[in-house]
Amino acid sequence: MIATILLHDVCEDCGVNPNELPVSDTVKHAVDLMTFRVMEGETKEIAKNRYYNMLLQSREAAMTKLIDRCHNVSSMAGTFSVEKLKSYIEETWHYVLPLLRKVKNQYPEDSDILFVLKYHIISVVDSIEATMQVFEENK
């Protein structure tokens, strides 16, 4: 799991082929699943649906995605533009939290970890949404 967490962005960010990574096949597969790709003829929305559904093929990929989202929502307020915040929050509600529910059903042994991730993600997202709403109302 740790190797997947550390390497999950390497293919997208560095153009590395997952098969070239000096790690187990389990990690290679998880990293490959976490590499977002829009296939020829796909819209970005269709690609996202495919991507999030494919993550369920690997416990490591699914858990890493959720851990990464938890980390990213925790640091996004000070670094994302308002438009990026809105988009990221929408993706979190539409794709990430449904993924979390599916992961909980598929990997019940991780339900304690998933509870903490869900609680943290929702708490941070709710706080940011409330802050943005107050900001918009006070314009």
Language-model region placement:
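Active-site helical microenvironments for divalent-metal-assisted chemistry
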Residues: 1-139
